[in-house]
């Protein structure tokens, strides 16, 4: 780690603002940060709910540098600890971690740092922090502050409940003079109350920030030919970093292989792989050696890669919290990012079937509530951002103009006759076939199974041949959403059945408006590019700065975003700083990073400016 006398000077009499500027390289606080930091410095416990990408980590890292003593950071994931420690060390901060991934020799080195008082921050797992051996070790240090990251893990209402978190309620008794800060990006009201109850927080400062991530565009793509749709979307990203989530290991492997066959740098990641292989995939992704990771939900929590430009869900997540957290791994640098959910009603029905196979317990009721909420989100015809925010108790009325519903509002038509055709066909084939078969009968397809079952002789055979398969898929989905048709998952295949509500439609007793099938929502993305994070930056210089960053990162054996993130490089490409004073005005460039990395970037910028000047003179 860099042992710089400059850092000692910076933190000799630190204030929150001086640490923010000198160590982390930012000129001002983001909304909520300063009040949370001041609460900690005043000795208050705090509950902080702050969206990913809004600077949650700084809320405890800055007080840690202001306090005279050790800060404990309790974190659930080994890879997350290492990633955060790497970033702190890049800023010249004495930080380290203790966990099961280390050798005995490595653990002893950390323990020696603790005993000698070298460390400002120590990251540790929840299962380790409450052990007698850890208390004995920590007795050599003055613990002045405790941060509990991913605090939603303490709550059974949370989407990622971890039993080991429940023992953290004893921290307040063990360290009565140390303020405790519990932080999370995903906690509804019930989860927030659970966190407070378990942790016994006193003299509380509560900050519930906005859950909005305005730089992320939310899009739902109805599945027609899902693998083709996904491939088209990934290829349109033109080499940008992204994560694709699936619900099964087999699907992860198949999609990764299919993308590689299309020329995409893609890797699979799931719990069935050897640990060493998973670690290699994660490292390759962090270091921009792999473009796309196709993963189960196990991937992503352990990294803070800032330049993930898209997250795609090939399957429906089990809760809005999971969806929000997973999509939140995109755009952490505040630059535009895409979140695409590929969906069909069978996805929801399948998750419902799995859930109902569990014993009937209070936990199953919680999971049912969360599953229904994500189903409502997927089927909504209103602004997706408003649905998301409303779930977390943040009520807004103004549509976002940055989701598929806002960019391409559904167009309505009189759908009564179409609905009657679909329902009649479902009824005539015995309510024991799925959507594909019903559509084949509707469209009069010459299908061997249809002929074997004599369904080509039905009165409904071919009554929908004037419209496309995609049209009828859309009609069936909407009838499911509206409750006129239900999809029943059996051990064999999903089947369509009529509900009691279908009678009024079949009899024509009520009007029915349906939405016209939309062209691919993904194609709308291509025609509605998002705003760029920094206006008027030199794109050629930005590309050269990224290449230089990759060279430095590989040499230092760290991920590129730990050197400087994309937003910082865009500012450099706009303002073109060539002196230390100018460089320190760039967000994300602190004194330590300037000392460690600044010179080659300024040299490259100087060279680029000379090239531009020569070109202008020649004109």
Swiss-Prot record:
Q: What keywords does the record list, in alphabetical order?
A: ATP-binding, DNA damage, DNA recombination, DNA repair, DNA-binding, Helicase, Hydrolase, Isomerase, Metal-binding, Nucleotide-binding, Zinc
- One matching Pfam family is Helicase_C
- Catalytic activity annotation: Couples ATP hydrolysis with the unwinding of duplex DNA by translocating in the 3'-5' direction; ATP + H2O = ADP + phosphate + H(+)
Identify the residues that bind ATP: 50-57
Any one GO molecular-function label of the UniProt entry: ATP hydrolysis activity
Cofactor: how and how many bound:
Requires Mg(2+) for helicase activity.
Q: Where is the Helicase C-terminal domain?
A: 229-374
Q: What does the UniProt function comment say about this protein?
A: An ATP-dependent DNA helicase which unwinds DNA in a 3'-5' direction. Plays a role in recombination.
What is the recorded name of this protein?
A: ATP-dependent DNA helicase RecQ
Organism encoding this protein? Haemophilus influenzae (strain ATCC 51907 / DSM 11121 / KW20 / Rd)
């Amino acid at each position: 780690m860099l042992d710089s006398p400059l850092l000692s000077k910076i933190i000799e009499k630190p204030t929150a603002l001086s640490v923010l500027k000198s160590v982390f390289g930012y000129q001002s606080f983001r909304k909520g940060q300063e009040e949370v930091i001041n609460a900690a410095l005043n000795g208050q416990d705090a509950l902080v709910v702050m969206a990913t990408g809004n600077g949650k980590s700084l809320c405890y890292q800055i007080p840690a540098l202001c306090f005279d003593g050790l800060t404990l950071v309790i974190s659930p994931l080994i890879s997350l600890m290492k990633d955060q420690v790497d970033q702190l060390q890049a800023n010249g901060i004495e930080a380290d971690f203790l966990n099961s991934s280390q050798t005995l020799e490595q653990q002893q080195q950390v323990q020696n740092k603790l005993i000698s008082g070298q460390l400002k921050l120590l990251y540790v797992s929840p299962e380790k922090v409450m052990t007698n051996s850890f208390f004995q070790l920590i007795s050599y240090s003055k613990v002045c502050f405790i941060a509990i990251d991913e605090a939603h893990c303490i709550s059974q209402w949370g989407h990622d409940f971890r039993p080991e978190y429940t023992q953290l309620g004893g921290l307040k008794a063990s360290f009565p003079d140390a303020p405790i800060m519990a932080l999370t990006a995903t906690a509804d009201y019930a989860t927030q109350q659970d966190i407070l109850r378990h942790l016994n927080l006193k003299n509380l400062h509560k900050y519930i920030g906005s859950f909005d991530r305005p730089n992320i565009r939310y899009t739902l793509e109805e599945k027609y030919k899902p693998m083709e749709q996904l491939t088209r979307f990934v290829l349109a990203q033109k080499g940008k970093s992204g994560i694709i989530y699936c619900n099964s290991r087999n699907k992860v492997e198949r999609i990764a292989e299919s993308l590689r066959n299309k020329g995409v740098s893609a890797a699979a990641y799931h719990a069935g792989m050897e640990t060493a292989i998973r670690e290699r995939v994660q490292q390759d992704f962090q270091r921009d050696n792999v473009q796309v990771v196709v993963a189960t939900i196990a991937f992503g929590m352990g990294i803070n890669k800032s330049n993930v430009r898209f997250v795609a869900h090939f399957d429906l997540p089990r809760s809005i919290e999971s969806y929000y957290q997973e999509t939140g791994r995109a755009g952490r640098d505040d630059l535009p990012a895409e979140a695409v959910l590929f969906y069909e009603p069978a996805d929801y029905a399948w998750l419902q079937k799995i859930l109902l196979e569990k014993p009937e317990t209070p936990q199953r009721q919680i999971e049912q509530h969360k599953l229904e909420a994500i189903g409502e989100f997927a089927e909504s015809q209103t602004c997706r951002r408003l649905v998301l925010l409303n779930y977390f108790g943040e009520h807004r009325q103004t549509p976002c103009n940055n989701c598929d519903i806002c960019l391409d509002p559904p167009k309505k038509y009189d759908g009564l006759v179409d609905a009657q055709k679909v329902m009649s066909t479902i009824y005539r084939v015995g309510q024991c076939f799925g959507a594909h078969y019903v559509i084949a009968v509707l469209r009069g397809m010459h299908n061997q199974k249809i002929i074997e079952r004599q369904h080509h002789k039905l009165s409904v055979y071919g009554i929908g041949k004037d419209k496309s398969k995609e049209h009828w898929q859309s009609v069936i989905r909407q009838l499911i959403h509206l409750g006129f048709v239900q999809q029943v998952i059996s051990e064999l295949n999903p089947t369509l059945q009529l509900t009691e509500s279908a009678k009024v439609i079949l009899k024509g007793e009520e009007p029915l408006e349906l939405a016209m099938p939309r062209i691919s929502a993904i194609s709308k993305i291509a025609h509605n590019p998002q705003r760029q994070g920094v206006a008027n930056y030199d794109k050629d210089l930005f590309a050269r700065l990224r290449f230089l960053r990759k060279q430095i990162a590989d040499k230092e054996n760290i991920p590129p975003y730990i050197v400087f993130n994309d937003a910082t490089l865009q500012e450099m490409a706009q303002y073109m700083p060539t002196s230390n004073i100018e460089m320190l005005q760039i967000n994300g460039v602190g004194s330590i990073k300037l000392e460690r990395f600044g010179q080659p970037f300024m040299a490259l910028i100087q060279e680029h400016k000379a090239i531009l000047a020569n070109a202008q003179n020649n004109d």
